[in-house]
């Protein structure tokens, strides 16, 4: 079966963005005027997903509200002739059907993925997992991953090729050398978490996109919890590899924005704003003036 269900883990506290995230989930912080989770949902929908399962904590249900219609607001905007604004608030509900899976305790990414199993239909044999802290641009890597799964079966992971001196910040793939699979597609032999540059088996590191065969749920039930009782998705994938399940990776050669800390988020916000036809020209001029030493409202 083709991809039908996409999963977005969104149960985290967003502590790096406090105090804002006391009341606003990090996933709803906007890049220009669009929350990151809507951008991720658009990527999933473009890859063919019809359902978005948002894994969230019991006190963080407001994320799902972004994907629900608000008839009163819609009527008000129609009455006032604000068609552009109306189109913006209809975009998320029209993208994809969203629902919630509750993660009662934050016990790792593997645990978050495991919470989704009750949401699936019997014939859901694959899910996409998209981490909302990672924006992979331009869209398209999920479609390529789906093609690889159609050809080879099993699970498919997204990888980035980084400079060797940076590998110690990531999980690094150990891969088979098989040129017959084509450029940027490799079978995974294993994974090493945050190795030193000298010990890393490659410079291919895990990115925030996974296309997982349903067998991953059984694997998650059989792995040993780590520190704090957490279940790591990488451990479940490693078990699949060990037991002979096909696991491949696709190297993403496009751009990536990490949104997990304020500095990275600001870089992404500037990038998106400069690309925005409405706001980009003015912002570019403003930034150039700052660089030229023409002053700031803050000094």
Predicted features, each with a name:
Residues 63-65, 73-76, 83, 87-177, ...:
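Conserved beta-loop-beta/alpha segment of the NTase-like Rossmann-fold superfamily
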Residues 1-6, 281-288:
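Positively charged, low-complexity intrinsically disordered leader regions
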Residues 2-79, 84, 103, 140-143:
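N-terminal glycine-rich phosphate-binding loop and ensuing alpha1 helix
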Residues 283-299:
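Intrinsic disorder at enzyme termini
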Residues 128, 142, 146-150, 178-285:
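Catalytic-core segments of class I nucleotidyltransferases/pyrophosphorylases
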Residues 36-39, 111-115, 236:
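Well-ordered alpha-helical segments embedded in enzymatic catalytic cores
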């Amino acid at each position: 079966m083709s991809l039908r269900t996409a999963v977005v883990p969104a149960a985290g506290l967003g502590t790096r963005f406090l105090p804002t995230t006391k009341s606003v989930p990090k996933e709803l912080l906007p890049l220009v005027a669009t929350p990151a989770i809507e951008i991720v949902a658009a990527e999933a929908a473009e890859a063919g997903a019809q359902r978005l399962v948002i894994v969230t904590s019991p006190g963080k249900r407001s994320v799902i509200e972004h994907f629900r219609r608000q008839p009163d607001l819609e009527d008000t905007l129609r009455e006032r002739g604000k068609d552009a604004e109306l189109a913006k608030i209809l975009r998320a509900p029209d993208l994809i059907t969203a629902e919630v899976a509750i993660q009662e305790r934050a016990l790792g990414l593997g645990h978050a993925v495991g919470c989704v199993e009750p949401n699936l239909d019997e014939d859901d044999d694959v899910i996409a997992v998209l981490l909302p802290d990672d924006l992979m641009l331009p869209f398209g890597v999920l479609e390529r991953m789906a093609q690889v799964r159609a050809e080879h079966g099993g699970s498919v992971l997204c990888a980035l090729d980084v400079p060797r001196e940076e590998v110690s910040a990531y999980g690094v793939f150990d891969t088979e050398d098989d040129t017959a699979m084509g450029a940027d597609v490799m079978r995974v032999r294993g994974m090493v978490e945050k190795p030193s540059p000298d010990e890393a088996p490659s410079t291919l590191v895990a990115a925030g996109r996974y296309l997982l065969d349903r067998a991953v749920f059984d694997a998650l039930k059989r792995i040993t919890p780590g520190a704090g009782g957490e279940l790591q998705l990488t451990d479940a994938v490693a078990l699949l590899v060990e037991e002979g399940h096909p696991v491949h990776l696709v190297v993403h050669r496009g751009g990536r924005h990490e949104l997990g800390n304020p500095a990275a988020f600001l870089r992404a916000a500037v990038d998106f704003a400069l690309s925005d036809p409405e706001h980009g020209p003015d912002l570019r001029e403003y930034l150039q003036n700052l660089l030229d030493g023409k002053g700031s409202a803050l000094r």
